[in-house]
Amino acid sequence: MLCIGMMAVTALVLQAQKPALDHSVYDDWKTLSRPSVPYDGPWMYYTVSPQQGDGVLHVVNALTGSEWSCPRASDFKISLDGTKAVYKIKPKYQETRQARIKKKKPDQMPKDTLAVLDLKTGAVEKYELLNALYVPFELADWVAYTKHVEKKDSLLKKEDLIVLNIKTLEQDTLKTVTGPVFNRTGRQIAYVCKPGAKDSLRRAGMCLYDAAAGVTDTLLFADKKAQLGKVYWNEAGDRFAFYANLDTAKTAAKQIDVYTWADGQVSKVLDHGHASIPEGWKLSDNPGLGWRFGDQALTVGLCPIPMEKDTTLVDFEQPQLDIWTCNEDYLQSVQKLRAGTEKNRTYLSLLRLGDGSLTRLADEDLPEVSVPLDFQGDKLLAWTDKPYRIRQQWDTDPCHDVYLVDLRDGSRTLVATAVPWTRISLSPDGGCYVFYDAVKRCWMAYMLADGRLTDLTSGLGVNFFDEKDDHPCLPPPTGGATWFKDSRHVALRDRYDIWVVDVTGKDKPYTMTEGRGRAEKTMYYVNLPYSRPQYFPRPTVIDPAQPVYFMTQNEVTKQGGVAVKDLSRRRSSLKSLVQGPYKWDALCISTAPKKPVLYYTRESFESGRNLYSTTDLSKEGTLVCETNPQIRDYNWGTVELMKWTRPDGIEADALVFKPEDFDPAKKYPVIFYFYEKDSQTMYSARNPAPSRSVVNIPWFVSNGYVVCDPDIYYKKDGHPGRDGLESVMAATDELCKNAWVDQAHMGIQGQSWGGYQVAYIITQTDRYAAAGAGAPVSNMTSAYGGIRWGSGIVRAVQYEQGQSRIGKDLWSGFDLYYDNSPLFFVPNVKTPVLIMSNDNDGAVPWWQGIEFFTALRRCGKQAWMLQYNREAHNLNGRWHSKDLSKRLDQFFGHFLKEEPMPEWMEKGIPATKKGLTLGY
């Protein structure tokens, strides 16, 4: 008994002695990639990467359990027969870092290496100085690559393509290659041979290399000045199409034609002078050529011939200005950001290879038309928001005109105007569209055969819109549509359950989840396991012959789970495989063993995100990878769900994070961090990491703080500031019922919308000893007409219908804009505040932070503002994030732990000392 007691005491002492996280731990904290299972073999692979440094890819055999590790691997691919793998080895992080410090030129920087891994023995063959790697979609025997050539007198040129047999390691070299493209099976490479001007031995042309035979065939000879474009293979890999301009005359420099190679022959299938190409228009090589209708047609792009620049004008004498007009679709700020896209915009046409006819499907009035890969019909729907683009400045609700486009002649029929259709999805057979009608708040089906429009969900007695949405606009649907393979049934999600609806109306709708979601207040989400990719990607469908998996989350407890239903059995019932205080994700199945092995990730705040395998999810899985075992070495933390009823009747939730060595007999400083609603993330893993904008919860908890993250509840009456205040104050009241809360040392922190709420709260109460406001809006009246420079759009829409939740324009709701603006109540502030407002913020105008700071300064308040140079809304530079982490630590440490005030807070950093000291 004495021994046991001493052991218990020792354990407690060891626990108490666990060190707190410090700012040096970030780089080694790792993330786990999604596991992947290629083809139908036994192999699974995943990558574990530190935040800064070199990651390791792990390849695991589901049959034998054997594992190979591949340091710094990327672009990893396993061969069809499962015997080899090909990948790039990136240079070591420190080597690249040192080269950057020494300011080496690009050609002197460390280079990638090509690696071929023998999955039987683990042996790796390496090929250094890799420039570019070309791997076929189905890796069988060959890959191709180019090298960085170091010596000018080398026989190998940088344009030379090396074809490598990964089984025999034999190589072949193809000279002066551009644009090589494997076909799907990896047996052939189509490429352009383009010798240099001084090379008199080789001719330019489109070539085809047969890897098995080692033979190159020049399919089309061309002048060295001719333009030969990228190759577009069909899915079978037995033909390809390409753009070319063989006319080297200057007058023809911008005209291209379309060619195909099929049945051993190259043919021009579309001439730039085709009668169906309107005057002033031309063929464009952007976005490319697409095979359709069983390889009997090609989608091609047309575009207006661009305006030529007047070269007689002197550049420096030309006015440089932007002209804003009220009748343009988009503001100049949007147009400038989209200028590159618009200059390259093309309009879809369909080329029938049988008769050479060209049908224009899209134009400037109906710019977005697409023909799905497997579509075999004559007509399809297309929609445009063009007539409603100006109103999108303030109206987020979906609005489109919908047309029925005839693929035979390009004619179009107006189906509906100004319709609020969204989440539009075409059935796999191309016969039916389903979409969500935001006004009717139901799912609809449109039959292409007869134009019949059917309401799919209004009569089901449940809502298919987000019942919790609290924005002043039409609520979005609770999810998208997932088609069944039969193109007749579609899966739709209400708040809790997954419904199966027959779009023909013959079968009665039913819940695939058997109503358990609503009965148990558990939300179900279809989670189809990772499946083999397709050469041309297609939407994922539900196959009734395969089990359907569901990720679940209980709305009350926030616990996650996994369920399954075997649709191949007539009387199959939903089976809950596992449920508990975790979040499950990333299902993938290796079907090579006799009993399929399922890989999945499981995570929680306490354990992190780890990888498991199992043949039976109802039993505890086998740990494949513990991503961050060092969690056990530090004073980590726990998370609890705090639930209570507010005085106004709202059933409220908040997450409460406590240190691992929490002692209820002690007093703890508290930081309230908030944004909107985060309680559903209770079981998400959280890594220590440099802050891009907000307090890092693991770090602060480990260092003796309690962190409370309350959900914010908005009442949709135009008072979001008050709603945030009431939500945070209510959570504070509830938490303060615990004697361990140090009520004299409580702080608040948030970023962006959270930063705004922090700014508002400190103008209404002095309850908090310190506040951190990242990228806050301080003056809604000036922010209303500001620009989100990252997208170019005006911010008005955010206030009238979006996150800022005012619900009115500035003039009809001026009192609301005034009442919700922290700037006008700055004289009330008593709380010291740290602001971050960066000068390249693309979301919140930088001057909003300046307005707030200068007002606080004018009113004699305690305030600091961090302005990271050339930084965005959330910090991108890791060195900046590390700096912010230290300053958040010191700021809250001073006011909530009574630690000494650092130099940067006491004296600032004068501009004359910028870059010389950080003032820590």
Where are these regions (language model features)?
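Bacterial Sec-dependent N-terminal signal peptides
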Residues: 1-19, 777, 786
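Beta-propeller folds
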Residues: 16-598, 603-609, 902, 907-909
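Glycine-rich His-Gly loop
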Residues: 385, 553-554, 603, 673-677, ...
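Active/binding-pocket-proximal capping segment
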Residues: 448-464, 505-519, 568-570, 580, ...
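Cap/lid segment of the alpha/beta-hydrolase catalytic domain
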Residues: 459-471, 618, 625-745, 749-751
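Surface beta-strand/loop "capping" patches
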Residues: 531-542, 634-649, 916
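Conserved glycine-bearing catalytic or ligand-binding loops at nucleotide- and phosphate-handling centers
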Residues: 612
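Active-site-proximal cap/loop segments of hydrolase catalytic domains
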Residues: 687-920
